[in-house]
Amino acid sequence: MPGNQQKPESLETDSDTSPSCGLSDLSRGGSLESRCSSSRSRSFTMDDESLKHLTHEEKDVILFFEETLDSLEYDFDEPALCDSGIHCHSPQSLEESPSSHSEPEDVIDLVQPAPASGEAESLPDMPQVTGAPSDTKHGTPFLEGGKQAAENSLPPPDSRGPEVFPLPPSLPVPAPSAPRKELMSPSPPAEHPKLLRSVPTPLVIAQKISEKLAGNEALSPTSPSKEGRPGEWRTPTSPASRNGDHVGVWHRHTTQSAPKVHRFPSNISVTNSAGKDFNKTISKAAVNVQERKAQVLANINGMSFIAAGDTSSEERWQKAEEQRSGSADGARTLGRAGMAGEPGAPCAGVPARAQQSRAVQTEQPPALANGFQSVHEALRSEPSSFVPTSKTITFRPDPAVTGKLARQNASRSLYEPRPDGSQDARKRTGSLPRAVGFRPQGITVQFSGRGSTEEARREALRKLGLLKENL
């Protein structure tokens, strides 16, 4: 062929294109000469630069895309494409195309081998359907001539066989989509799915959309397709958008999901309130720890005060116990204090009335299950590791005894025995009951429902008789 002699040896795959371009130039006029020459020049430049390292198939695909782009530049005014010459021209159609240009049998011959290409979904089908009527060199009435030629080419059953019979009733289907002529023009060959690879998927989807738009304009909110005209979804789909079907079609519908957005900060506020309560419990626990440290020292010193013969503080202690007997927490803590105040051999100078009041108070709290404290109570009654310096607690005895007891408390808590403590203080601390598994007990004051203010602390300590009233 003379076309093969014009191309270099490096472009091996272009051997099929040159005869097709030559025959198409002979049959369809000189309008395609510039197009084939542009594709040749493009392929030559690519051959010199980038086609050296490409394979046989890659060169074929690149050339196919070049010719497709060349055909799209003319906007279907001169739609005889070289890609149809590459893949679709059988020798029978090549012989018939120069002889009979306007006959509908040429269209049938061009469309029938079209599925063999299979590389483009919608673009190869459009020139194959409209290839023969364009041979008359009319640029403007191309779409109308293509439709007439396609309708004329469908009825003869000799070349198509028995597959053509269900086609005539399906011809008026693409009528509603008049503005989509460039997509709907190859729709008649797209209607018979029995042909291999002859149904382009975008055309079927567009046809279904046009049918739904034509038949369901009034019932558009109930149609399952979301690709309808946006004007129909403005007013009637406000209830459907609440269900989440068409949310995001209009910005007006996205504002209806605002209650969900407002629920989320409410959840956050709930968790924040729970966190505040948790912080309150932490602060209460910290206050309880500080009060426990103060009360441990006050309890030990208070026992020594009772041993010293302070009967007025003992009377106030008894009155405070009677007032707080209704509270379960107060009864439990005072019961622990009473249990701690029951020695096997009572100290000298302790009145019998104080012993009786302590015995009464020990009967009020429920007895422990195993005779041991719970972990929580044991931790709360644990003595402090340092001597607290609280200003709200003042002690009645002289400073000498107070200093001795403070030093003794520090030595007991740090487990470092000091020999400078007096023998009386050691006898008093040794006379306290120490069961196996028990730690030295103290009074824990719980402020339930009250704040951690200074007045509440002083009032509680005043009720317990541990605070000097005339400060």
UniProtKB/Swiss-Prot annotation:
Modified positions (Phosphothreonine) in chain numbering: T45
Region (Disordered): 1-46, 82-247, 310-365, 383-437
Omega-N-methylarginine carried by residues: R263, R450
Modified residues (Asymmetric dimethylarginine): R263
Residues annotated with Phosphoserine modification: S43, S187, S220, S223, S431
Membrane recorded as keyword: no
Keywords from the named record: Methylation, Phosphoprotein
Bias kind Pro residues: ranges: 154-177
Biased composition (Low complexity): 26-43, 90-101
Biased composition (Polar residues): 354-364, 383-393
Cystine bridges: none
Top-level taxon of origin: Eukaryota
Basic and acidic residues biased stretches: 313-324, 415-427
Name of this chain's protein: Proline and serine-rich protein 2
